């Protein structure tokens, strides 16, 4: 109502000569708390800054005496100060004069006047203010709040002043609180600390946008908040992750002349480090020192943690050494940051050194220290060490948290030790640590890996009952389990359930479906899933394209496989050595060996890749199967010259190719080379040797390798056994054939059912 009167009567304001406001009008500032103000007119000889002042000026003309008179209900501006002090001091709240004052429609206008009369005694003014609030139907105007805030602040009653300001802001006034506070500033001896208090109150209440607007107005009137208050706003923005607002306000506060403190820089550096912008953090660190501020433990901890999390381990050590050189004592947080970053990037031994140094310096490792090391040992597969630290942790009286337990549970699940995983899970519940979504997901994943899908689904169902909402990782684990079990229908049901919960599938989930469908040779369905993924704005990666390409080659459709390679290049998707291995192997198996050779020769120039052992092996195998044994041998030699170690498959392919060409000596030389380097023959290698030698009429050697094979515990299949026996019969080696047949039946490698497959003699 009062702000409306001010606008209606064109109440304007001008500033005292001792205050130098900005030339721009306050009406330009838009705020949820803002009420438009008219601009000052130079032609006006007087001004009124608020409804209270306007009415009191008006009443100066009327000049009714402020006393109780029969037949009158109007009061003049001349209060009997002693009377009002006496009424308030003695709690004479039923005084007729006071009753009539609050019976008036203009009571909210008169109350500020009474407060001004009582300003010499701030406690009485505050007492009257609080009593007024108890009156039924009465509500203080913004002017009342502002006047009493000024009075209390001048009296250094800061706690009460802050309470009043907070209550005023929460009352959701329909006009700009700052403007009214400014217009009433001369009620007491001018002081601008109350504006900083308003700024702080807005921050404390989480009204950050309003705080920014308040700061802007303070800048216009050259009334600047304290650095401590600015730090409060920076800290709030940083906690909310509003990095852009942090940067913007830091620049504004410096521009307004605020002098940043160590705490200011600590907030900024920590914020930049959490965003991963470590170079910006370094710049602030150097700027801080340039201003003559000395970094403290918090500063160094932020720098060490920030650089450590992005893998800049050398920098973390440099900051750590500088910290000690500056006589800034590292604390447990410092060492925890160092242990974490070195463990995270696979340097567990160095992390352990920092752990020992921490203990050597008399610092006690906390739950975070132990949990970090337990997790690191688990990820390295060093379960005994992980359990040792877990036991030590309990021994020193520390209670493992959900992170500790979940690390151990996840590690046990990954090695298939589900009994210990569930034992730890039960222990976790017994000590009062609830399972979180990560715990459930680890156990579900473990059950799926063990193909215990029924139990996995039951545990998944218990999550909602326990008040734990499954996340994307939980669904990924269960869906992957069903896909691996080839139960695509149930996997699809879970996908729809996931979408119904508002969870968006990610690249991993789509990739799982594509892999599952491709393994079932449902390539078109996999293509549909891939198109859906693209529609959702998720770009397929190299692995997904490689999976689909492999499926096309295996289905005998090399054209589509090559089309996917072209698509990868068009979309700038990385063609990896894995992709290339699938390409070469797929072309060779589809009898497109010349095309495979062409791509192999272009691997460096066109794709920027170096062929690895797997690619060479695929090419060697393809050439051998295409009867190009000489080219395969040349490629084998090139492979060795490049420092690549041929594997068992490469040797077996080349050995098999030589046997097919009748090159028995070359084939046996390859077998001797395998023995020389300690490479044991497997089923395929032995099969190649036995089959090759028998078909080259080297029956004695074939029999020798067959017996060696059986002696090694490698059982030849019946096809090979019958093939060797038939060769004996073909060459007329009847006695040897009968003896061999008896030998094979003795080792249960032939049954009587196979007699029909052998020639009748």
Swiss-Prot record:
PPR repeats lie at residues 141-175, 191-225, 226-260, 261-295, 296-330, 331-365, 366-400, 401-435, 436-470, 471-505, 506-540, 541-575, 576-606, 612-646, 647-681, 682-716, 717-751. One of its GO terms (molecular function) is pre-mRNA binding. Disulfide bonds: none annotated. Keywords: Repeat. GO terms for biological process: mitochondrial mRNA processing. SUPFAM superfamilies: HCP-like (SSF81901). The keyword Repeat applies. InterPro entries: Pentatricopeptide_rpt (IPR002885), PPR-containing_protein (IPR050667), TPR-like_helical_dom_sf (IPR011990). Coiled coil: none annotated. It comes from the Eukaryota. Gene3D superfamilies: Tetratricopeptide repeat domain (1.25.40.10). One of its GO terms (cellular component) is mitochondrion. Belongs to the PPR family. P subfamily. This is Putative pentatricopeptide repeat-containing protein At2g02150. It comes from Arabidopsis thaliana. The lineage of its organism: Eukaryota, Viridiplantae, Streptophyta, Embryophyta, Tracheophyta.
């Amino acid at each position: 109502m009062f702000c409306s009167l001010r606008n209606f009567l064109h109440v304007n304001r001008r500033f005292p000569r001792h205050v130098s406001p900005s030339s721009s009008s306050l009406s330009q500032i838009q705020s949820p708390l803002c009420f438009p103000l008219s601009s000052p007119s130079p032609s006006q000889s007087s001004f009124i800054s608020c409804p209270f002042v306007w009415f009191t000026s008006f009443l100066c003309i009327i000049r009714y005496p402020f006393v109780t008179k029969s037949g009158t209900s109007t009061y003049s501006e001349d209060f009997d100060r002693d009377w009002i002090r006496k009424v308030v001091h003695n709690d004479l709240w039923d005084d007729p004069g006071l009753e009539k004052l609050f019976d008036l429609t203009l009571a909210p206008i008169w109350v500020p006047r009474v407060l001004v009369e009582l300003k010499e005694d701030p406690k009485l003014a505050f007492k009257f203010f609080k009593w007024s609030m108890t009156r039924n139907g009465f509500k203080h105007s913004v002017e009342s709040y502002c006047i009493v805030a000024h009075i209390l602040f001048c009296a250094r009653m800061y706690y009460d002043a802050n309470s009043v300001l907070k209550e005023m802001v929460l009352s959701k006034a329909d006009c700009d609180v700052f403007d009214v506070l400014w217009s009433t500033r001369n009620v007491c001896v001018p002081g601008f600390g109350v504006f900083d208090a308003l700024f702080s109150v807005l921050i404390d209440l989480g009204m950050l946008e309003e705080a920014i607007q308040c700061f802007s107005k303070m800048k216009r009137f050259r009334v600047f908040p304290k650095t401590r208050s600015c730090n409060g706003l920076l800290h709030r923005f940083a906690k909310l992750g509003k990095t852009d607002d942090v940067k913007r306000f830091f620049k504004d506060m410096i521009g307004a002349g605020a002098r940043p403190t160590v705490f200011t820089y600590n907030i900024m550096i920590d914020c930049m480090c959490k965003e991963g912008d470590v170079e910006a953090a370094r710049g602030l660190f150097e700027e801080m020192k340039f201003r003559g501020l000395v970094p403290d433990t918090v500063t160094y901890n932020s720098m060490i943690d920030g650089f450590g999390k992005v893998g800049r381990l050398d920098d973390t050590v440099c900051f750590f050494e500088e910290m000690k050189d500056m006589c800034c004592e590292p604390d447990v947080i410092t060492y925890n940051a160092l242990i974490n970053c070195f463990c995270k990037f696979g340097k567990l031994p160095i992390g352990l050194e920092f752990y020992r140094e921490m203990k050597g310096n008399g610092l006690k490792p906390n739950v975070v220290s132990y949990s970090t090391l337990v997790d690191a040992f688990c990820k390295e597969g060093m379960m005994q060490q992980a359990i040792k630290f877990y036991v030590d942790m309990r021994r020193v009286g520390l209670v493992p948290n959900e992170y500790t337990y979940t690390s151990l549970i996840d590690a046990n699940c990954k090695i298939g030790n589900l009994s210990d995983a569930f034992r730890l899970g039960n222990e976790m519940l017994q000590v009062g640590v609830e399972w979180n979504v990560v715990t459930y997901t680890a156990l579900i994943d473990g059950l799926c890996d063990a193909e215990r899908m029924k139990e996995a689904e039951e545990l998944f169902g218990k999550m909602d009952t326990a008040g734990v909402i499954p996340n994307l990782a939980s669904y990924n684990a269960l869906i992957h389990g069903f896909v691996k079990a080839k139960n695509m229908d149930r996997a699809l049901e879970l996908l729809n359930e996931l979408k119904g919960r508002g969870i968006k599938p990610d690249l991993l989930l789509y990739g799982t479906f594509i892999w599952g469908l491709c393994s079932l040779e449902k390539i078109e369905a996999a293509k549909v899933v891939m198109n859906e993924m693209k529609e959702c704005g998720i770009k397929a990666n190299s692995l997904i394209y490689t999976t689909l390409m492999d499926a096309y080659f295996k289905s005998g459709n090399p054209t589509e496989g090559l089309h996917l390679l072209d698509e990868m290049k068009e979309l700038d998707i990385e063609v990896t050595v894995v992709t290339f291995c699938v390409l070469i192997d797929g072309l060779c198996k589809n009898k497109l060996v010349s095309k495979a050779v062409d791509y192999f020769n272009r691997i460096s120039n066109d794709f920027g890749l170096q062929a690895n052992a797997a690619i060479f092996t695929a090419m060697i195998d393809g050439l051998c199967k295409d009867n190009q044994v000489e080219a395969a041998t040349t490629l084998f030699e090139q492979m060795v010259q490049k420092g690549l170690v041929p594997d068992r498959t490469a040797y077996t392919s080349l050995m098999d190719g030589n046997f097919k060409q009748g090159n028995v000596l070359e084939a046996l030389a390859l077998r001797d080379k395998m023995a020389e380097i300690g490479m044991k023959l497997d089923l395929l290698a032995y099969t190649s040797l036995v089959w090759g030698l028998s078909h080259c009429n080297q029956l004695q050697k074939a029999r020798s390798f067959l017996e060696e094979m059986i002696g090694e515990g490698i059982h030849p299949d019946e096809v090979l056994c019958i093939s060797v026996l038939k060769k004996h019969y073909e060459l007329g080696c009847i006695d040897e054939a009968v003896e061999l047949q008896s030998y094979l039946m003795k080792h249960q490698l032939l049954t009587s059912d196979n007699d029909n497959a052998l020639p009748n003699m």
